[in-house]
Swiss-Prot record:
Cytoskeletal protein that is involved in cell-shape control through regulation of the length of the long axis. Residues 30-49 bind DNA. It holds the Pfam family RodZ_C. Residues 1-111 are cytoplasmic. Residues 133-336 are periplasmic. Residues 152-235 are annotated as: Disordered. It comes from Enterobacter sp. (strain 638). Keywords: Cell inner membrane, Cell membrane, Cell shape, DNA-binding, Membrane, Signal-anchor, Transmembrane, Transmembrane helix. It is a single-pass type II membrane protein. Residues 152-164, 220-235 have a biased composition (Low complexity). This is Cytoskeleton protein RodZ.
Amino acid sequence: MNTEATHDKTEALSTGVRLRNAREQLGLSQQAVAERLCLKVSTVRDIEEDKAPADLASTFLRGYIRSYAKLVHIPEEELLPMMEKHAPVRAAKVAPMQTFSLGKRRKKRDGWLMSFTWLVLFVVIGLTGAWWWQNHKAQQEEITTMADQSSAALNNSGNNGAQSVPLNTDSASTSSEPQTAETDSQTVEPVQTPAPAMTPDQTAAQNAVVSPSQANVDSAPAVTPTTTGNVNVTQPLPTDQAGVAATTADANALVMNFSADCWLEVTDATGKKLFSGLQRKDGTLNLTGQAPYKLKIGAPSAVQIQYQGKPVDLSRFIRTNQVARLTVSAEQSAAQ
């Protein structure tokens, strides 16, 4: 009867009460138990008071109780039935994984953004390439057109040069005829001047002797002084005029030296095309017109330009390797 009563009394005690009684029998304090089990004092107190902390999982609580029972020498089998009541195993609530779905959604959005970015980049690169190709093709067509125009201009200039030679010769011959006629008329006049009166004998003798000499005087000596006189009088005038014209022309002179074959076109302020064609290597071109000049040069690196004795800067066209289109004036030359 005593054994059964003791057993019933033991079953009536809760898990926490039995653990506290065993601790007190061993003379241990809650602080000592907490230090040995590496627990908080509040956790040991909750176990002895049969409290289940809300923030503590039942699995951990059952483990703490088992460790506490081993420490105070209580068999684990005696505590198992009471542990089911004191710390029942609660079903864990499995929360849906939001992080994976959010990451997948974010990854999908980033994928669309990257695709759009690459698409924009490809479009920009394509447009840039198309613009460069069109510009390059236009330059090639322009250079081809310039070369065709230059060859045609060279052919025309060759034909015009061949036709102009006889015309200049004829004009020179025609201009010389009036001068000869003038000299003849001037030489005849001194011969026809009246002679002083002479006796009949002297007249006859003089006619016999002088007649041959008069023929010679009419043919050669008379022409020579009059011709030289006319040349000395008339030639200085065109020389002075040419000097004045050369001085005026040099003020707007445009000099170009070529280090390689180059096509160019030069137009003055009146719209007159001074030159249009191809210049060969080591060539020099001197042009005079009314400033300012408009120049179109196919190869700027192959030409050196001087205007009014000052060089014209073509470096900006040489760097870009493009056809040079510029206007040369006195202000631009002074600024350079």
